[in-house]
Amino acid sequence: MSPAQKIGNFTILAKLGEGAESHIYAVQDNKTKQVWSLKHVVREEDKDARFIEQVEREYEIGSKFDHPVLRGVHKLIRHRRMFKTQSVSLIMELVDGVSLDQQLPTSQKGAVEIFRQVAEGLLHMHGRGFVHADIKPTNILLMEDGGVKIIDLGQACLIGTVKKRIQGTPGYMAPEQAHRQAITPKTDIYNLGAMMYWVLVREVIPTVMPPKGTDNTIFSGALETGDIKPPVAPHLKNPKVHPLLSRQIMDCVQLDPNDRPASMEVIVNRLELIMDVLENPSEPAPEIVGDEDTRA
């Protein structure tokens, strides 16, 4: 077997994808025969050091979680030459799933169940003191058994972090991300709301960082919040969307973090309430009136 088919003590089974400076493979540990997902980043130039640091941060953060919705992070391997790190390999749980952008839910109840699981995973992250900061359809994997996995902790950070660079995804990015203000759990609430909107309406919401191209990856420049028109409510775009779910999404994507729901726990509770309504349509639907009144 040629060296190109191995990375350290791991044999490459398949290429799963790639990022800006990373490649992701399905691999097998040659010693234990266990199968993993491996993210590999090579430092070819000095400017690549930040991509190495990003993977190291992804390991440091991911290793602190233990939740079924968050992809498990196993270990980080540094490949050195002359005492200098030339590349890193992040060994992660191999998830057999399809991203949400490629396999949309076939029912509103199915969509709400996906949203609820994502919110549960984010609630766990917040409880450990971290924010994901890049929730979007491509970072959500759907498994055959109905489970969900949140992936890609490359933008994750401690609650309250003020980043030096604008990071996030146009079309999903909260105003505080585009304006380099403190990242908090309410940032994830906005990102989740923007993702829910896209899933149900198939359009990105108007954000302070709108996409320049159709792939939602190119920044067009940050706008002021006063220049942004509120999105049309989902149920007005798609009449199949329940008004309670539409209200939930609109609450999440408020431009001012103070106007969003108080916590991800509130989101979880509301989504459970909405699921109850969808499963029991003959019963009167409760009104969501505030952060504390979520189970009335």
Segments (PLM) and residue ranges:
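Short beta-strand micro-motifs within the conserved protein kinase catalytic domain, predominantly
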Residues: G72-V88
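Conserved short submotifs of the Hanks-type protein kinase catalytic core
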Residues: F83-S99
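Activation segment signature within eukaryotic-like protein kinase domains
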Residues: I114-F115
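Conserved activation segment of eukaryotic-like protein kinases, specifically the C-terminal portion
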Residues: K164-E176
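AlphaC helix of the eukaryotic protein kinase fold
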Residues: E45-K64
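Protein kinase catalytic-loop region centered on the HRD/HxD motif
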Residues: E120-F130
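Conserved catalytic-loop aspartate of Hanks-type protein kinases
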Residues: D188
